[in-house]
Curated annotation (Swiss-Prot):
KW Ligase (keyword) present: yes
Database matches in PROSITE patterns: GATB
UniProt protein name: Aspartyl/glutamyl-tRNA(Asn/Gln) amidotransferase subunit B
GO MF: asparaginyl-tRNA synthase (glutamine-hydrolyzing) activity; ATP binding; glutaminyl-tRNA synthase (glutamine-hydrolyzing) activity
Organism of provenance: Lactococcus lactis subsp. lactis (strain IL1403)
Length: 477
């Protein structure tokens, strides 16, 4: 029997606010254990949560980016469960009145196939702390993450293949990234994904029994985990077995999903309205204010790059792969520089440097202004493309002005025939055999002489001018 795969995803996105959702403690990542905490995070008796308005702002922006309706009146709920990293023994979340509902997002597969995935809801909640199990036999709790604001985005079970799930995550990450509310870095935990997977015979409307899969810390691992889980369930069903409703975790070393626990239902959490956080009324003016503050989407930017700047679809997609690069590009072309040249540098030397140094654009000295200044120096013949690579490394490491560095380092390209001719004659004198070979009909000998000329000028000779002069002198030598 053949089965249809049914997949729904629950994605937690960490919001980039300076303070936590209900406490003034910092959300900064990477501090020593339990240093970014407050009495509210510790749940000391008598302390009360105070709502961070910026979290609701972010929630509205996310809902708008995902084409969702917004609950104009909403409240928070208590989700009750006990775990060491949850000192209150409950999590403040949203149950029946999420901030956003009835949304959708368009996905595109590698083969060009497009589909629309419905989004059931997006709700705000606080993150839990983190447990660490030491080699000394003790377990430790770090509450730095406790209270960090999250938005959980729950899709409908509209995906039918792991490839569609991968495409959905890609589209979702892009949509959230361009709102500016999160950096959505899965490898750093600011985007986390759980998957609900079930199979059903083709033609059957009712869903099969689902399993939840956790611990997928990269896009590729999501696909691997789903591939394994679909295959596992299919083998059980074909053998006449039954699927249990359970939670499983993905082991990225073995590529398998492993049983964690029997799956809980909503009733197990005993949701009820949070009495310490008041109901919020979201006005239409508030929503419109957030809508106006949203930057141009990646999709709109791609259309602008292709239709208005004459860039290729490939270039447009590469430039919008991250918002930081797209923002940098947009700033750079304001300096009246050829968009294609800026695009080439960002995709070429800049991308290679960032990859090799394991850094992001904001962490190096390159700016839209000094990059475009360097490109102009190439265009007007002040420096060669080869010299430009040296200039770029200097700008990336130390910042500053491209023009000032070129002058200070003596890198200005030599284009004056009066300067080049004596050097050419000296090259001829030192390479008489190559000159004789050229005059004897060996055209490649001239290339060797050009190479010697560039070496003699330390790469500063204008290649076009130098080559033209050299050939003229060879013919008259």
């Amino acid at each position: 029997m053949n089965f249809e795969t049914v997949i729904g995803l629950e994605v937690h996105v960490e919001l980039s606010t300076n303070s936590k959702i209900f406490s003034p403690a910092s959300t900064k990542f990477g501090g020593d254990p339990n240093t970014n905490t407050n009495v509210i995070d510790w749940s000391l008796p008598g302390v009360l949560p105070v709502m961070n308005k910026g979290v609701i702002d972010s929630g509205i922006k996310a809902a708008l980016a995902l084409n969702m309706d917004i609950h104009k009146s909403m409240h928070f709920d208590r989700k009750n469960y006990f775990y060491p990293d949850n000192p209150k023994a409950y999590q403040i979340s949203q149950f029946d009145e999420p901030i956003g509902y009835n949304g959708s997002i368009e996905i595109e597969l590698e083969d060009g196939h497009k589909a629309t995935i419905r989004i059931e809801r997006a709700h705000l909640e606080e993150d839990a702390g983190k447990n660490t199990h030491g080699t000394d036999g003790y377990s430790y709790v770090d509450l730095n993450r406790q209270g960090v604001p999250l938005i959980e985005i729950v899709s409908e079970a509209d995906m039918r293949t792991p490839e569609e799930a991968y495409a959905y995550l890609t589209a979702l990450k892009e949509a959230i990234l361009y709102t500016g509310i999160s950096d959505v870095k899965m490898e750093e935990g600011s985007m986390r994904c759980d998957a609900n997977v079930s199979l059903r015979p083709y033609g059957q409307e009712a869903f099969g029994v689902k399993t939840e899969v956790k611990n997928m810390n990269s896009f590729s691992n999501v696909k691997k985990a789903l591939d394994f889980e679909v295959d596992r369930q299919a083998k059980i069903l074909r053998a006449g077995g039954e699927i249990r409703q359970e939670t499983r975790r993905f082991n990225d070393k073995t590529g398998e999903t492993i049983l964690m626990r029997v799956k809980e239902g909503a009733s197990d959490y005993r949701y009820f309205p949070e009495p310490d956080v008041p109901r919020f009324e979201i006005s239409e003016e508030w929503v419109e204010q957030m809508r106006e503050s949203l930057p141009m989407t990646a999709k709109a930017r791609r259309a602008h790059y292709i239709n208005d700047l004459a860039l290729s679809d490939y270039d447009a997609r590469q430039l919008t792969a991250t918002k930081e690069v797209s923002d940098f590009f947009d700033q750079a072309i304001k300096f009246d520089t050829d968009p294609k040249l800026v695009s080439n540098w960002l995709q070429g030397e800049v991308a290679q440097y960032l990859n090799s140094e394991k850094k992001e654009l904001h962490e190096i000295g390159l700016t839209p202004e000094n990059l475009t200044e360097m490109i102009r120096l190439i265009s007007d013949g002040t420096i060669s493309s080869k010299i430009a690579k040296k200039v770029f490394i200097e700008l990336a490491k130390n910042g500053g002005s491209a023009e000032e560095f070129v002058k200070k380092a003596g890198l200005v390209q030599i284009s004056d025939p009066a300067v080049l001719l004596p050097i050419i004659h000296d090259v001829f004198a030192k390479n008489e055999q190559s000159v004789a070979d050229y005059r004897g009909g060996k055209q490649n000998a001239a290339k060797a002489l050009v190479g010697q000329l560039m070496k003699a000028t330390k790469g500063q000779a204008n290649p076009t001018v130098a080559q033209k002069l050299l050939y003229q002198e060879l013919d008259n030598f």
